[in-house]
Amino acid sequence: MVDTWFLDSIEVVRGPASVLYGRSSPGGIVALTSRKPSFDPGGEIKLFAGNNNQRGAMFDVTGPVDDNDRVAVRLSGMTRYADSQFDPLKEERYALMPSLTWRITDNTRLDLMAYLHRDPEGGSHSGLPYDGTVVPHSGKKISNTFFEGEDDYDKYDRRENMVGYNIEHLFDSGWSVRQKLRYLHTKVELNQVYAAGWLNDTELNRGYSGSDEKMNAITLDNQVDGSFDTGAVNHRVLIGMDYQDRTNNVTGYYGGFPPIDAFHPVYGAKPDYITQYSREKHKLRQTGYYLQDQMSIDRWRLTLGGRYDQVSVSNVDNFNHTRSDLDKNNFSSRAALLYLFDNGVAPYVSYSTAFTPTSFAD
């Protein structure tokens, strides 16, 4: 998850998009494009404040570092803090994104980037019963500032580090080759004491859940694209091969806590018990090969595309000594036809398929 301050654009691709993006939801995807260095010097600083003691700062600075406009850098950062409606819970974030662009030659460009992100506090991740909030319980309503947890046991800490590069070379013929690589490491710790229904007229039952999660992921995308003509038809062709490897380690806990008076809470309780119930490792590998041809014939635009994926999923629970595996191959396709009118109207028809392998094998 990249904070929107570091994004140059957000594009919503509606419908199946597996041909170009690989495994994805049939409903579509959200494509995020981060800010890149500019050879035009610039910068900005923003300060903000709001209710719930909200405050923060953002900055962004970019420009060339040499006289020949071969190398440019960019540094963006932000910090944010806010109280929540529940007294002990806060929201806090720190993030930094350095990036560099190097014009190695007139036809070759290298982009380097890193993203460092931490949320040491994440606000509330719980909820309260309908009976007592929306409607009264035993003639009373719970205060909207009531906190059902325990400050010593409720914790949210998220860290995310990402590095990557894009390299592109443009040939004199107009064809180009590019490679994109990203490595991501994420660590999340979430511990929570939560309400579990009414015990009596004033007290709520409580439970405990906790998880420690780490993820390492690498994605690599290689592309070749260019254009050529066959008679009256202009072709814009994209050929690619991508690869991703993702490993997710999750340890889960559950437990019990003494009940709490929802109308006159007293804090400082200790857990009745906390027990580990899982220690899982989920691994996904995917390799995809894709081809797309965008054809222009006078006012007509015809797009045809296809993609072949090989996916391997394994799930190991080292606590319960279980394992499941899944190997799957799939072909995804896309076809679209559009006509351009002089007034700008462009009716079209499109058909596409999506490939969404489950992360958990049965």
Residue ranges and their predicted role:
Residues 5-8, 19-96, 104-108, 161:
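Outer-membrane beta-barrel translocator/receptor signature
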Residues 28, 41-43, 55-59, 94-98, ...:
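Hydrophobic, lipid-facing positions within transmembrane beta-strands of outer-membrane proteins
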Residues 37-42, 66-71, 107, 172-174, ...:
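Short loop/turn motifs that connect adjacent beta-strands in outer-membrane beta-barrel proteins
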Residues 43-45, 71-75, 110-112, 177-181, ...:
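Transmembrane beta-strands of outer-membrane beta-barrel proteins
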Residues 47-53, 79-83, 94, 116-120, ...:
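Transmembrane beta-strands of outer-membrane beta-barrel pores
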Residues 56, 82-88, 119-125, 135, ...:
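Outer-membrane beta-barrel proteins
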Residues 80-84, 96-103, 107-170, 183-215, ...:
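Acidic/polar loop-and-plug regions of large Gram-negative outer-membrane beta-barrel proteins
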Residues 101-105, 215, 234-238, 242-244, ...:
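Structural signature of Gram-negative outer-membrane beta-barrels, strongest in the C-terminal barrel
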